[in-house]
Amino acid sequence: VRRILAVVIVFASLGWSASATAQLRIVNYNVNNSDPAAFGPRTGMDAVFRGMNASAKGGFARAIDVLILGEAESVATTGTAYAALLNTVTTGTSYLRSTVDAGSTGSGRPIAIFNSSSVSLIAEKKIGSTSGAASQPRQTMRYQFRPIGYDATADFYVYASHYKASTGAANEAERNVEARAIRADADAIGQGARIIYSGDLNFYTSSESGFQTLTGTGNGQAFDPISRVGSWSGSTTYKDVHTQSPATTAVFNGQVTGGMDDRFDFQLITGEVRDGGGFDYIAGSYWAFGNTATHAVNQAISTGSATTLAARIPGYTTTQAQTVLTSLTQVTDHLPVLADYQLPAKMTATLAALPARVIRGGTVSATLTVANAAPVAVAAGADQLDYAYTAAGAVTASGTGSDAALGASNTHVLTISTTVVGLRSGTVSVIASSPQTMSPTFSGTISTS
């Protein structure tokens, strides 16, 4: 005698809220706007921002998500002005400024501008002191960001700094004071934190004590994402990473000239941001924007090849690229540092519905579909989703899978026992192993009666 079994599936799927495509572009830029009479962007900055938004050295173009500014007058003045400019030159965004002013004894302070469509600013913290035995010229700001559509496991930190300038043992020692304060704070966050150390760090060589402090062992150990450590100042070997000065002739009061000969501006990262998983640096994307190593050392960046620059900015003509190069010599006295970062994976899992009734002893299969739903525009914009699935009770299945961002999703067949009449149930579980995965677990129940 054959009995008919009614089959019911109950499942829980941890999904995600839709958000804008959001692999992240982070830029730090000393803009020399500390003068209260000249706190806003200079003529030509719009061309620089448009060029950065369109540049694709890492393989894709992306509007700036986080902009760290050095030598800002204040968040209320410089911050408001730059957020307004970015909202003008970039569509589909909503740029906001940070809210806390770091202490400063001169030459402004670091601030942050961020695209609230792609990241949230979770916290701001001042690091160090401008007075006392361990004083520094300007406090560092620590910003805690979270990608939109993710939870706290995807948070990352950006330290925004402007270290003591100039050569000499006393200045080097002062830079080390700043580096020690930052490392103490970063180490206290704990092992596994994803950190970017950004800003005008004013190092002339990687042998400086301050650079060694940042890159020393410990929770917050910094690494150069492009592995270009050495004696940068005045060296033709390192002209591709030089950031100051793009100008040889001053066009505004206080502009430092002298041509391109120093790597003062950096994005250094902790090991967790270069291990290939979760929030992570995208290899090949880091550069001093506008520097194609086609200029001469100690000459203006505008002596470089517009043709070579246009090749890194899809859709740009050599004329447009030359406008960018010229603007870089006029808007400030540093080049911006630009790098792209991937987002963590985002898992979705579903169980397909079964027929309401099946024949006892027949072969019944269910399907489990797992996908990487990271909200990106290109596959390189998010980590690969790696996972394992298991089943228990009346359901038989186990295995592993991977899905790239923008992948086609994976379907796994589950076998359900129908040999016994009466209530039969089983569970299906999926656990992601990719770091920081959003919605990393799934559990579904299959019942028969």
Describe the residue ranges of each PLM region.
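Sec-dependent N-terminal signal peptides
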Residues: I4-S13
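Sterically constrained small-residue positions within well-ordered secondary structures
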Residues: S13, S104, A134, G149, ...
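Divalent cation-coordinating acidic motifs and surrounding scaffolds
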Residues: A22-K346, G381-D386, A392, F442-G444
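Feature for long, exposed domains in two main contexts
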Residues: L343-S449
